[in-house]
Curated annotation (Swiss-Prot):
PROSITE patterns according to UniProt: GTP_CYCLOHYDROL_1_1 (PS00859), GTP_CYCLOHYDROL_1_2 (PS00860)
GO biological process, one term: tetrahydrobiopterin biosynthetic process
Residue intervals passing through the bilayer: none
Name of this protein: GTP cyclohydrolase 1
Pfam families assigned to the protein according to its UniProt record, in alphabetical order: GTP_cyclohydroI (PF01227)
Highest classification ranks of the organism: Bacteria, Bacillati, Bacillota, Bacilli, Bacillales
Catalytic activity: GTP + H2O = 7,8-dihydroneopterin 3'-triphosphate + formate + H(+)
Pathway: Cofactor biosynthesis; 7,8-dihydroneopterin triphosphate biosynthesis; 7,8-dihydroneopterin triphosphate from GTP: step 1/1
UniProt organism field: Bacillus velezensis (strain DSM 23117 / BGSC 10A6 / LMG 26770 / FZB42)
Protein keywords: GTP-binding, Hydrolase, Metal-binding, Nucleotide-binding, One-carbon metabolism, Zinc
Length: 190
């Protein structure tokens, strides 16, 4: 995979500062291009990561009931405006054939998918498909809720508005009771 070109980012940030009428050589902005390049390397680190890699290690566990990890905090960058959006992901699956993954692997998959220029809808479906393709569970349900700075800082300017997306596969798609169980667990306060 291609590495982030920090030098090119630094040059581009310097040009942006000049284009908005700022002096990139003034004290407060002198190291800004370097800081932004370093930040972009971090926030876009998922570009070189395949979320399916996190599900290669499985535990042979005879558990074919609901597994839910909720409130997985994440942040990403809107690919349309390159401003952040952030929120929580909730991942439920019902293992099949003893293929149980580590709980932290679900959170790592969220990180891998969110740390790139992204759409919330794609984050949601990519996580679900990665689990389906690697673990072959009875069902997967991924719900993502996020606040988008592109709706808060510009345009419609509606702070606090949340977008909710879901990807439903297998038994959760076909069985309303199973789907409702997951949604009730997600809504339940700790």
């Amino acid at each position: 995979m291609k590495e982030v070109n920090k030098e090119q980012i630094e040059q581009a940030v310097r040009q942006i500062l000049e284009a908005i009428g700022e002096d990139p050589d003034r004290e407060g902005l002198l190291d800004t291009p370097k800081r932004v390049a370093k930040m972009y390397a971090e926030v876009f680190s998922g570009l070189n990561e395949d979320p399916k890699e996190h599900f290669k290690t499985v535990f042979g566990e005879d558990h074919e009931e609901l597994v839910l990890v909720k409130d997985i905090a994440f942040h990403s960058m809107c690919e349309h405006h390159l401003v952040p959006f952030y929120g929580k992901a909730h991942i439920a699956y019902i293992p099949r054939g003893g293929k149980v993954t580590g709980l932290s692997k679900l959170a790592r998959a969220v990180e891998a998918v969110s740390k790139r220029p992204q759409l919330q809808e794609r984050i949601t479906s990519t996580i679900a498909e990665s689990i389906v393709e690697t673990l072959d569970p009875h069902g997967v349900m991924v719900v993502v809720e996020a606040e988008h700075m592109c709706m808060t800082m510009r345009g419609v300017r509606k702070p606090g508005a949340k977008t909710v997306t879901s990807a439903v596969r297998g038994i959760f798609k076909d069985d309303a009771a199973a789907r409702s169980e997951v949604l009730e667990h997600i809504k339940r306060a700790d």
